[in-house]
């Protein structure tokens, strides 16, 4: 409450509660005279299935509804009364949550901070800097830890999205943004290259294990 009773769908109530919490936070910054000088980053760590691809939660699959999340940045204003730099700008280049550190370090000139190799600053992208080509990796271990199924990994390369699974999937996001038509049988070349990239990335990570509930 007060949102639970106002919405038939509990998820809608959660969205409204989150919206109110963010609004209250921004209002408090303004009331204290801190909003203009503040760097504000709003993001989510995951999306939600809501019935898409048969999933009514999150964590099981790696389709766009789960891995494409909001990421908004408000930069500090140079002087009181001025609009924040790059206000209203958007970035068409696909980015990752790991790009937040590079963005924050760039926005407020954090001393002694070296962002991880391969990450990008959204500040520079919004200002017009071109991003180098990147393959974006996502992964979920929830199916293995929770159900004993296979873990999944997804690699986005341009318009292609490859899902590394016991039955691999490949989607052309340019023509099929809803990921309805698996074209893995028709695209052996992209599959080989993306599968090799996933295997290379896997070798550099340690997989998490389930936490004992006790």
Residue ranges and their predicted role:
Residues 1-214:
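Catalytic domains that recognize anionic headgroups
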């Amino acid at each position: 409450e007060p949102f639970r009773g106002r919405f038939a769908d509990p998820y809608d109530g959660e969205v409204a509660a989150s919206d109110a919490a963010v609004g209250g936070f921004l209002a408090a910054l303004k009331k204290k005279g801190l909003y203009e000088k503040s760097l504000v980053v709003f993001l989510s760590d995951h999306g939600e299935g809501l019935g898409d691809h048969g999933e009514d939660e999150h964590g099981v699959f790696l389709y766009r509804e789960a891995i494409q999340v909001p990421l908004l940045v408000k930069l500090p204003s140079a002087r009181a009364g001025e609009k924040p730099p790059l206000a209203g700008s958007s970035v068409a280049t696909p980015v990752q949550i790991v790009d937040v550190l590079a963005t924050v370090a760039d926005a407020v000139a954090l001393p002694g901070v070296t962002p991880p190799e391969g990450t990008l600053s959204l500040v520079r992208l919004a200002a017009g800097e071109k991003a180098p080509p990147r393959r974006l990796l996502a992964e979920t271990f929830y199916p293995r830890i929770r159900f004993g199924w296979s873990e999944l990994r997804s690699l986005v390369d341009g318009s292609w999205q490859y899902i590394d699974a016991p039955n691999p999937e490949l989607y052309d996001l340019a023509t099929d943004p809803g990921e309805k038509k698996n074209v893995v049988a028709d695209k052996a070349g992209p599959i080989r290259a993306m599968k090799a990239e996933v295997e290379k990335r896997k070798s550099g990570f340690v997989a998490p294990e389930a936490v004992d509930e006790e």
